[in-house]
Swiss-Prot record:
It comes from Danio rerio (Zebrafish). The gene is ggact.1. This is Gamma-glutamylaminecyclotransferase A. Coiled coil: none annotated. GO terms for molecular function: gamma-glutamylaminecyclotransferase activity. One of its GO terms (biological process) is modified amino acid catabolic process. Pfam families: GGACT. Its EC number is 4.3.2.8. Keywords: Lyase. May contribute to degradation of proteins cross-linked by transglutaminases by degrading the cross-link between a lysine and a glutamic acid residue. Catalyzes the formation of 5-oxo-L-proline from L-gamma-glutamyl-L-epsilon-lysine.
Length: 161
């Protein structure tokens, strides 16, 4: 009986690591962009920069609204390979991002294959916020591989390849 109590005391002091989830950001949540502060706000949860990456397959990333926010259209095989950043987030941050990205109404969180830009160019899987609910005319808009609202090429991952 004493051994069981000691065992329970030992295990009650162990802090299990937070659930870690990879998320690929390609627009306003990237470092240096207008909503990056949301990823660094610990009241939303935890997020840690992992590396720069690009989509394995091309996707159309378009600027389709007057606000000039990027939309990654969930149409793999069309458009360009999109560059962005992979963050490791906890469940609280993922829940916040779902709400922030108006998931599932505006964006949908889906899994995507990525190519890491540093090292051997390994592949990685991550969640991304893309949309399948868009005006069909958006497919006729110009596509981009990099989003940078500041116009500063130092604020994107392409230069780190």
């Amino acid at each position: 009986m004493i051994a069981i109590h000691i065992l329970l005391l030992v295990f009650s002091n162990i802090v299990l690591p937070a659930l870690c989830i990879n998320v690929f950001v390609y627009g306003t949540l990237k470092k240096g962009q207008s909503n990056y502060h949301e990823l660094t706000n610990t009241t939303h949860g935890q997020a840690e920069f992992i590396t720069c990456a690009r989509t394995k397959d091309p996707y159309p990333m378009v600027i389709a609204t007057k606000d000039k926010f990027p939309f990654l259209l969930n149409v793999p095989g069309s458009g360009q390979q999109v560059y962005g950043e992979i963050y490791n987030v906890d469940q609280n941050m993922l829940d916040f991002l779902d709400e922030f990205e108006e998931c599932p109404d505006l964006y949908q969180r889906t899994s995507i294959q990525l190519k890491i830009l540093k090292g051997n160019g390994d592949s990685e899987e991550a969640f991304v916020y893309s949309t399948s609910t868009f005006d069909p005319d958006w497919l006729n808009k110009p596509t981009f591989s990099v989003y940078d609202a500041t116009g500063d090429p130092g604020n994107n991952c392409v230069s780190r390849e």
